[in-house]
């Protein structure tokens, strides 16, 4: 999908609350057992992989900005879209994208 407006609309519509599960991680360079200890760069790789699957878009620029292992929180950007990976109340990692940079 090359239409930026269409991509932004998709991100706003279905970009929040994506649980990172085995199916979503399939083919990702970061494996499931590495998620709890990943650094910001690895979080960006996970976000870019998931972004590509969810939105049928090849990510060209990714950047991990912050990680807080104690809080279970990682942030960064993929192709100008902000991302946040957070641990929810039941222990799942949830990926949220936003149309504005994190």
Locations of the language-model features?
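Short terminal alpha-helical segments
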Residues: 3-28
């Amino acid at each position: 999908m090359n239409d930026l407006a269409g991509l932004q609309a998709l991100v706003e519509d279905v970009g929040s609350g994506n649980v990172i599960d085995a199916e979503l991680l399939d083919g990702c360079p970061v494996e499931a057992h590495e998620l709890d200890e990943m650094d910001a760069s690895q979080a960006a790789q996970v976000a870019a992989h998931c972004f590509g699957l969810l939105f049928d878009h090849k990510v060209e620029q990714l950047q991990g900005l912050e990680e807080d292992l104690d809080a279970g929180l990682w942030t960064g950007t993929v192709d100008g879209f902000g991302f946040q990976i957070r641990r929810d109340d039941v222990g799942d990692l949830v990926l949220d994208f936003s149309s504005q940079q994190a």
